[in-house]
UniProtKB/Swiss-Prot annotation:
Region called Disordered, residue ranges: 1-59, 349-373
Biased composition (Basic and acidic residues): 38-52
Organism: Coccidioides posadasii (strain C735) (Valley fever fungus)
Purpose of the protein: Catalyzes the first step of the methylation pathway of phosphatidylcholine biosynthesis, the SAM-dependent methylation of phosphatidylethanolamine (PE) to phosphatidylmonomethylethanolamine (PMME).
EC category name: transferase
Protein name from the UniProt record: Phosphatidylethanolamine N-methyltransferase
Cytoplasmic side: 107-109, 217-223, 299-300, 409-414, 488-491, 593-963
C-alpha cells in the first residue's frame, strides 16, 4: 500500500471554474421552480465537491469513481457478484476442502508450501509488477500493446471476447460514475490489476490461517490460566490488527490500498490521522500484529517462524518497491539554488589577499561559524583507517573481541566484564552528559579549543570523535559482557528457551532499526548534538520516527538491551539493563530537555503522534487521571532539577579541591554475465544494408607527452581515430533493410568484451536502445530514440547501386553510457536476440589531462580560471547536461539532485582524478556545490601535493637523491 499523500495538481481550479452566464435575458421562473432549481444546484455542487479527480501521466483528468473494499465485495451478500468473485471464492473453498481431506501427517508441510507460494506471489510477483510499472509503465504498455481496452467495433481489438468479459466484470463492480469505454487506459489497467491483487491477498491470508489451524495444539502441561491468558493476548492482537487495517483503509481508501499512484495520481490532499500517527508504515509494521496473535493462539513455533518470515518479506517489499516509488513520486528534488555559496566569497577574498601559494604565507585565521557544518566525510556508517577515531574504535573492538574469546567464563571474569560494561555505560551517559551540559551553559568545550588558537569546527570534529568512540565502546563492552554471561540451553524444547531467543533477537533488531531511523531523521548534525555547538536560528521539525515519538531512544532505543536480558537470562544483565535505562532517561531529562527548552522554547511539542492517538481513545475519567499524573511527574522532575542546581556549586567546589590536591600529588610523583539468445534463421535479410555511424563531441585536445615517438604515432592516427569526450551524448545513425525486425536493438560495449563479431556474448547491462517504438515492454528501452524507419536512398561502402533502406537516429546519454575510459563500439542486434548485424567503427572515450606545462601553478589568479574552464564542460557532461542540475557557469550551484543521487558525484570524482591526478571523496563534490569551489579545492590540493607530483610540468617535483 503506497502510504504517501498525492500531490494536489490544480484540481481545485477545475472544480471551482465558473461558466459565464448568457447575455440573453431569460423570463423569471415561478417561485416553486426557482426553489427547486436552487436545491438541485446545491445538491450538484455538494456532489461535485465530493468527487475525486484523477490525473494520468499524460495530463488527462477524469472522475475517479467510488469503489468498495475487497472483503465487502467478496463476502457481503448485498454486493453484486461477478465471475471473478466466484473464482476467488471457489479457490478459497478449495483451500478449506484441501485441509479437511489431507492426512494429518502432511497437512503442515503442504500448507506451509501453499502459504509461502502465495506470499511469494504477493511480495515477489506483485512487487515485480509494481516495480516495472513504476519504472517502465509496463502494465499500461502491455494493455496498450494487447489493445485490451480498444472497442472491437473499431476492428482494432484482436480479443473481442476478452474485451466484453473485462467490461462486464468492471462495470458490475462500479455501477456509478464509471464508463468502461471512456475511462483512461491507466485506470482500467489498475482495475484489472486490483482483481489479481484480490485473488493473491485473499489466498495469502486464508492459507496462513489454515496453516495455523493445521499447526494448532495445546502444549503439554499448560494450565487453564496460562491458556486463557494466551488466547486473550492472541485475540487482542488480532482485534488490534483488524482495527489497524480498517482505520488505514478509512484514511487512504482504495487508491493507496491498491497502489493506485503507480498508475495515476489524484488531485486532492490526503490527510493522515488515526493509525498513521501511531507508527511508521502501519500497514507493514503494527498491521502484522495479528500474525503474532494467531501464533499465540496456535501455540506453535512453526507458525511463529513462518510469521516472522512473512513479515520480513513484507518489509523487503516496502524497502525495494514502495519506498523508491514514493521517493520518486512525492519527494521531487527542490529547485536549484541560484545563489552562490558564501564560502565562494571567502575563497575569493583569500585569493585576492595573496596571488601565490607561497609556503611561507601566513594562513588566515579561522572564521567563526554559526551555521550548521556540512558533513563531507560521515563518521557514522563509514570506516576509514586514515582517521584516528576509526582506528581507535577498530583497535579497541579487536581488543574486546580477543579478551572475550580468549578468557574463560569463570565468575571472576564475568564480574570483570560486567563491571567494565557498567563503567563504560556510566561514562557514556554521565560523562558525556556532563560535557554537553557544560557546553550548553558555558560553551566550555568550544572555549578550550579557541584558547589554543583552534576554531569552532575543530572543536566540533574532536567532539564527534569522542562521542563516537564512547558510544561504540559502551555497546561493545555490553556485548562482551552478554557473551560472557550467555550459556547455550541444554534442551531447546524445554520451557521458553526458543521464545526467549526469538523475542530477544526481535528486540535487538528493533533497537538497530530505531537507531537507523533516528540517524536518518537527525542526520550527522543532530546525531552528535550539533545544536549544542552551533547557534543557528532555531527551527524544529518532526520527521521520520520523531513524527510518532518525542524521544524514541527512551524506550525503543534501548530495546536491544532488554533483548540481551531475555537471551542470556542473567541477573547481571538485568542490572546492566536497569542501569542503562535509568542513566539514559536521566540524560534525556537533565541534559537534553533543558537545552531543548532553552533553544526552542514553546515550539517544542508536548505530545507525539502515538500519545495523541492513545489519549483520543481514552475515556474522560482516564484523561483526567492521566493529566493529574503528568502534573505530579512534572513537579517531581522540577524539584529534582532544583535540588541539583542548588547542590551543583558545592559539588563543583569539592571537585575542584579534589583535582587540585590530586594534581599536586601527581607533580611529585586512537563480472561479467554471459547472456546469449540467437535467431536461428537470418535468411532474407541483406547484411550490407545494415550500418552504424557514430557522431559525438570530439575531444578538444590530446594528452601531451615529451616522448617523441609517441607523439609521431599519435599525430599519424589523429585523422583516423575517433576520440570523444567523457560523458558527452553520442549520436548513432543506423540503416537496415526495409523488412528488418521491429525488435532490433543497438547496444554499447567495450571492444575487448566480445571476441566474436557475429554474436554478442556479454550483457549490455542496460546500455541499449530499441530501434522502434513500442517493440519492448519497457519505456527505458526507448529513452534516446529520436527517429526510426525513415526511408532513405543508400549506396553502402561497395559502390553498389542506390537502394532504399530504413534509417533512424538514437542518442546514448546518461545511464546508457559506461562512464569509463576505453575503446568502445556499438552493435546492431536482430529481433531482440544477440545476432550481430552491424558493428560501428571503434571509438575512444578519454578524459583529457589538465595541461600544466604552460600554466604557472604558483600563481593562483592564473591557475584557478584555467582549472574552472577545464572543469566546467566535463562537469556538465557528468550531470547529463540537464539544465536543472548542470551549471551554466563556474559560480552557479549544482542542482539539488546531486545531493540525492551519488552517481553524479562519483562521475565527477572519477573525471577529476584522471584529469588532475587528485582523488576526492564523492561527498566533497556535494559539499563544494559549484565549479568555483571545486576548482579552489583542486588548487589547494595541487599546492599540498606538489612535492609528490609525478607530472612533468614546471615546478616542484619529487626530489631525487643524487649519488
Amino acid at each position: 500500500m503506497a502510504e504517501a499523500p498525492a500531490v494536489p495538481m490544480g484540481g481545485a481550479g477545475l472544480r471551482e471554474r465558473k461558466i459565464q452566464a448568457s447575455r440573453t435575458q431569460e423570463p423569471s421562473p415561478p417561485p416553486d421552480s426557482l426553489m427547486s432549481k436552487m436545491r438541485t444546484d446545491e445538491s450538484s455542487k455538494i456532489e461535485s465537491e465530493n468527487k475525486t479527480f484523477g490525473r494520468t501521466p499524460d495530463g488527462t483528468v477524469f472522475t475517479v469513481p467510488h469503489t468498495r473494499d475487497m472483503v465487502s465485495q467478496l463476502l457481503s451478500p448485498s454486493e453484486p457478484k461477478n465471475l471473478s468473485d466466484i473464482l476467488v471464492l471457489t479457490i478459497l473453498a478449495l483451500h478449506i476442502l484441501l485441509l479437511r481431506s489431507l492426512p494429518a501427517s502432511i497437512r503442515i508441510p503442504v500448507f506451509a508450501v501453499i502459504f509461502l507460494s502465495w506470499r511469494a506471489a504477493y511480495n515477489i510477483g506483485i512487487g515485480w509488477l509494481l516495480h516495472m510499472q513504476s519504472n517502465h509503465r509496463t502494465l499500461v504498455l502491455w494493455a496498450r500493446k494487447l489493445r485490451l481496452f480498444v472497442d472491437p467495433a473499431t476492428g482494432q481489438n484482436p480479443h473481442p471476447l476478452l474485451y466484453r468479459f473485462i467490461k462486464r466484470e468492471l462495470e458490475t463492480k462500479i455501477p456509478e460514475h464509471y464508463t468502461f469505454e471512456s475511462a483512461p487506459i491507466e485506470y482500467n489497467t489498475w482495475l484489472v490489476f486490483r482483481r489479481v491483487v484480490d485473488l493473491i491477498l485473499m489466498c495469502d491470508f486464508t492459507s496462513y490461517c489454515l496453516f495455523a489451524v493445521a499447526c494448532g495444539s495445546r502444549p503439554i502441561g499448560e494450565g487453564l490460566f496460562v491458556m486463557m491468558l494466551r488466547w486473550l493476548a492472541g485475540t487482542s492482537l488480532v482485534l488490534f490488527n483488524l482495527w489497524v487495517k480498517l482505520d488505514a483503509h478509512r484514511v487512504v481508501k482504495d487508491f493507496a490500498w491498491y497502489w493506485g499512484d503507480f498508475f495515476y495520481l489524484i488531485d486532492q490532499d490526503l490527510t493522515f490521522d488515526g493509525v498513521f500517527e501511531m507508527a511508521p508504515h502501519p500497514m507493514y509494521s503494527v498491521g502484522y500484529a495479528g500474525y503474532y496473535g494467531i501464533s499465540l493462539m496456535a501455540a506453535s513455533y512453526k507458525v511463529l517462524f513462518i510469521s516472522i518470515l512473512a513479515h520480513a518479506a513484507q518489509f523487503a517489499f516496502l524497502v525495494l518497491v514502495e519506498n523508491p516509488h514514493i521517493e520518486k513520486t512525492y519527494n521531487a528534488p527542490p529547485p536549484r539554488k541560484r545563489v552562490v555559496d558564501h564560502d565562494t566569497a571567502l575563497h575569493e577574498d583569500v585569493g585576492s589577499r595573496s596571488n601565490s601559494f607561497n609556503s611561507d604565507t601566513t594562513p588566515p585565521l579561522p572564521v567563526p561559524s554559526t551555521t550548521q557544518p556540512r558533513s563531507t566525510h560521515a563518521l557514522v556508517g563509514s570506516m576509514d583507517v586514515h582517521r584516528v577515531t576509526d582506528v581507535s574504535v577498530l583497535l579497541i573492538h579487536l581488543l574486546f573481541f580477543a579478551l572475550t574469546i580468549i578468557t574463560p567464563s569463570t565468575p571472576a571474569y564475568q564480574f570483570f566484564f560486567v563491571l567494565n560494561a557498567a563503567v563504560w555505560r556510566i561514562w557514556y551517559s554521565a560523562g558525556i552528559g556532563y560535557i554537553l551540559d557544560r557546553q550548553s551553559t558555558r560553551k566550555s568545550w568550544t572555549r578550550h579549543f579557541v584558547k589554543f588558537g583552534e576554531g569552532q569546527d575543530e572543536a566540533w570534529r574532536q567532539w564527534k570523535g569522542i562521542y563516537h568512540l564512547s558510544m561504540t565502546t559502551c555497546y561493545a563492552s555490553f556485548i562482551a559482557a552478554a557473551w560472557k554471561m550467555y550459556t547455550l540451553p541444554q534442551d531447546w524444547g524445554y520451557g521458553l528457551a526458543i521464545l526467549r531467543h526469538v523475542l530477544g533477537a526481535s528486540l535487538i533488531a528493533l533497537q538497530i532499526w530505531t537507531s537507523m531511523s533516528i540517524y536518518e531523521s537527525l542526520g550527522e548534525f543532530g546525531w552528535f548534538f550539533g545544536d549544542f555547538f552551533y547557534d543557528e536560528s532555531p527551527k524544529l521539525t518532526y520527521s521520520g520516527i520523531y513524527r510518532f515519538l518525542n524521544n524514541p531512544e527512551r524506550v525503543l532505543g534501548l530495546a536491544g538491551v532488554w533483548g540481551a536480558v531475555l537471551i542470556t537470562n542473567s541477573r547481571a544483565m538485568i542490572f546492566l539493563a536497569l542501569l542503562s535505562h535509568t542513566l539514559s532517561i536521566a540524560f534525556i531529562q537533565l541534559v537534553e530537555r533543558p537545552h531543548m527548552q532553552k533553544l526552542y522554547g514553546r515550539s517544542l511539542r508536548r505530545d507525539a503522534g502515538l500519545v495523541k492517538s492513545i489519549k483520543r481513545s481514552l475515556p474522560n475519567s482516564l484523561k483526567q487521571f492521566q493529566g493529574s499524573v503528568d502534573k505530579i511527574l512534572d513537579e517531581s522532575i522540577e524539584f529534582v532539577e532544583e535540588v541539583i542546581d542548588t547542590a551543583r556549586p558545592k559539588l563543583a567546589a569539592g571537585v575542584n579541591t579534589f583535582v587540585k590536591d590530586t594534581t599536586a600529588l601527581l607533580h611529585k610523583y586512537p563480472a561479467r554475465i554471459t547472456i546469449t539468445r540467437l535467431e536461428p534463421d537470418l535468411a532474407g535479410y541483406e547484411m550490407k544494408d545494415y550500418s552504424l555511424t557514430v557522431e559525438g563531441t570530439q575531444l578538444a585536445q590530446f594528452d601531451k607527452s615529451t616522448d617523441a615517438t609517441n607523439n609521431k604515432s599519435r599525430n599519424s592516427r589523429r585523422s583516423e581515430d575517433l576520440v570523444l569526450e567523457y560523458g558527452a551524448p553520442i549520436k548513432v545513425k543506423w540503416t537496415a533493410p526495409l523488412n528488418h525486425s521491429k525488435k532490433d536493438w543497438i547496444g554499447l560495449y567495450m571492444v575487448t568484451h566480445n571476441s566474436s563479431r557475429e554474436i554478442t556474448k556479454v550483457s549490455s547491462q542496460g546500455r541499449w536502445i530499441a530501434t522502434n517504438e513500442g517493440a519492448f515492454d519497457s519505456l527505458t528501452s526507448e529513452v534516446g530514440l529520436k527517429s526510426s524507419d525513415v526511408i532513405i536512398k543508400y549506396t553502402g561502402n561497395d559502390n553498389d547501386k542506390t537502394r532504399e533502406v530504413a534509417s533512424g537516429e538514437i542518442i546514448f546519454s546518461g545511464e546508457k553510457l559506461w562512464w569509463n575510459q576505453g575503446v568502445f563500439e556499438f552493435r546492431y542486434h536482430h529481433n531482440g536476440k544477440h545476432n550481430v548485424m552491424a558493428i560501428s567503427r571503434p571509438f575512444e572515450i578519454r578524459i583529457a589531462k589538465f595541461d600544466e606545462n604552460e600554466i604557472p601553478l604558483d600563481n593562483y589568479a592564473v591557475v584557478r580560471p584555467a582549472i574552472e574552464g577545464a572543469l566546467l564542460p566535463i562537469i556538465q557532461n557528468c550531470l547529463d547536461r540537464d539544465p536543472d542540475i548542470a551549471p551554466q557557469n563556474a559560480e552557479e550551484a549544482f542542482g539539488s539532485q546531486v545531493d540525492r543521487d551519488s552517481k553524479y558525484t562519483k562521475r565527477v570524482v572519477f573525471a577529476v582524478q584522471h584529469m588532475f591526478g587528485i582523488e576526492f571523496a564523492p561527498e566533497v563534490v556535494s559539499a563544494d556545490g559549484n565549479v568555483r569551489n571545486l576548482a579552489w579545492r583542486i588548487c589547494n590540493a595541487k599546492k599540498v601535493l606538489a612535492p609528490y607530483s609525478m607530472s612533468r610540468a614546471s615546478g616542484a617535483t619529487t626530489p631525487v637523491q643524487e649519488d
